[in-house]
């Protein structure tokens, strides 16, 4: 697919320029309302801060977020040839087929498919750069510029132009979902080997040793984990780039770039972005480096089991909602967080104040 690099660069600049911080006045009104609701102060724990943050995203002290969409971007990685995963690259196209499969329960036979059906989210699937001939399917968005990234151990995974193009493709898919009614955007991914680029991105952006942020991914043993750390270390030694877009191009992946575009588009339109795990976290680090206001729109679902995720969340200054030991990806954790965020918004919107309910003791601890 041909790229108009000048137009793409201009479109990205425009997208970044549209991001504004959360509505501080709406958050102040939400905090004031929280203090008047029929409950002891702080009794709803972290739900209270989540509700205030949602007020800032949606610009009202009574947020009413509706639809949710999981946007699963799939891509292959040249670095998989280094043996950094417990699974072969052929799993990526097979899982794309699984996302699109017709099953007795409905569309999709993957974990994210089942969870999305159960918890009320639409699933969108994007070919961001799968190394296979994928069959035609009406539910598949085709955005691939090439079949998999280059091997980041030896060369840049993507060109800067490819990176920007995939970011814009992700933004376009998010726009589609939002136009269809999604107020929660949940980026998800599928790509064998993608915790390796995520580790490289995290190590460079946080300035930490690769061993501290490189985990087992699909479940590699100790020997292969040590090799994976070496691969990340050698990749980082290739170049000293620090510009966020250059870092993403050097060490990232097509699906990571696409997820970043989804996040930026959602924030630009003042929607909530639910972060799943480590790979999504690496995209978020790049995004906040590019546009600090993005942070206000990010809601980490849970701290995943992958080493390095806690460091990402600490750098972002964001608290996860749960810790279930998840490390699957696909957006699964993000979908599981939906009821918590919907519930948090409902407390602001639907609870009565002490005065409204004629309950004595307003403001008491």
Curated annotation (Swiss-Prot):
Any one Pfam family match given in the protein's UniProt record, by short name: DBI_PRT
Keywords: Cobalamin biosynthesis, Glycosyltransferase, Transferase
Signal peptide: none
Keyword Secreted set for record: no
EC number: 2.4.2.21
Catalytic EC class: transferase
Active site per UniProt: 330 (proton acceptor)
Gene3D superfamilies for this protein: 1.10.1610.10, 3.40.50.10210
InterPro entries, A to Z: Nict_dMeBzImd_PRibTrfase, Nict_dMeBzImd_PRibTrfase_bact, Nict_dMeBzImd_PRibTrfase_N, Nict_dMeBzImd_PRibTrfase_sf
Catalysed reaction, written as an equation: 5,6-dimethylbenzimidazole + nicotinate beta-D-ribonucleotide = alpha-ribazole 5'-phosphate + nicotinate + H(+)
Annotated pathway: Nucleoside biosynthesis; alpha-ribazole biosynthesis; alpha-ribazole from 5,6-dimethylbenzimidazole: step 1/2
Matching PANTHER family: NICOTINATE-NUCLEOTIDE--DIMETHYLBENZIMIDAZOLE PHOSPHORIBOSYLTRANSFERASE (PTHR43463:SF1)
Protein name: Nicotinate-nucleotide--dimethylbenzimidazole phosphoribosyltransferase
């Amino acid at each position: 697919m041909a790229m108009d690099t000048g137009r793409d660069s201009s479109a990205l600049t425009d997208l970044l320029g549209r991001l504004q911080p959360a509505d501080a006045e709406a958050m102040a009104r939400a905090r004031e309302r929280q203090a008047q609701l029929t409950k002891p102060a702080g009794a709803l724990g972290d739900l209270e801060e989540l509700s205030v943050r949602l007020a800032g995203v949606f610009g009202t002290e009574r947020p009413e977020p509706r639809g949710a969409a999981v946007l699963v971007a799939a891509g292959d990685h040249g670095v998989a040839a280094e043996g950094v995963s417990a699974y072969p690259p052929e799993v990526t196209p097979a899982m794309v087929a699984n996302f699109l499969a017709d099953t007795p329960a409905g569309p999709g036979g993957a974990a994210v498919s089942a969870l999305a059906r159960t918890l009320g989210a639409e699933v969108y699937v994007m070919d961001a750069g799968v190394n296979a001939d994928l069959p035609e399917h009406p539910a598949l968005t085709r955005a691939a510029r090439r079949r998999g990234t280059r091997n980041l151990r030896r060369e840049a995974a993507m060109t800067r132009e490819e990176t920007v193009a995939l970011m814009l493709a992700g933004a376009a898919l998010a726009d589609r979902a939002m136009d269809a009614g999604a107020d929660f955007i949940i980026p998800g991914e599928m790509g064998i080997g993608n915790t390796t680029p995520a580790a490289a991105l995290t190590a460079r952006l946080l300035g930490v040793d690769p061993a501290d942020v490189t985990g087992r991914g699909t479940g590699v043993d100790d020997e292969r984990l040590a090799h994976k750390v070496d691969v990340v270390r050698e990749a980082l030694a290739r170049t000293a780039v620090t510009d966020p877009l250059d870092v993403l191009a050097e060490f990232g992946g097509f699906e990571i770039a696409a997820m970043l575009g989804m996040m930026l588009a959602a924030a630009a339109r003042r929607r909530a972005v639910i972060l799943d795990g480590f790979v999504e976290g690496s995209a978020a680090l790049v995004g906040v480096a590019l546009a600090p206001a993005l942070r206000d729109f990010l809601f980490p679902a849970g701290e995943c089991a992958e080493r390095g995720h806690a460091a990402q969340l600490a750098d972002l200054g964001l608290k996860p909602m749960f810790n279930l030991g998840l490390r699957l990806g696909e957006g699964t954790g993000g979908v599981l967080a939906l009821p918590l965020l919907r519930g948090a918004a409902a407390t602001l919107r639907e609870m009565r104040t002490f005065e409204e309910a004629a309950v004595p003791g307003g403001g008491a601890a």
